[in-house]
């Protein structure tokens, strides 16, 4: 008899549970209402870290003058930053989906 398992939530916890259950031979289905990989992770954590990194890079350029380097004004291209964040989010969601699919986990 095959063990069947339904996991509600496709975030990091649900994905880990699904992966382990599949490795142990269970038929696994993940139910996710939003974004596979976790809405909080992909909509909050990733974008905020990308924005922090960009701000840090701008801040670092302000210290260049003290190191004998010519300083140029760095401006944040908000549209470019948003596109970068969206690309990261899409790649992570696709990678998560492909990994789960490769293990026979239904979504």
Language-model regions, residue ranges each:
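Beta1/beta-strand and adjacent pyrophosphate-binding region of the FAD-binding site
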Residues: 1-13
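Glycine-rich flavin
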Residues: 2, 19-26, 31-107
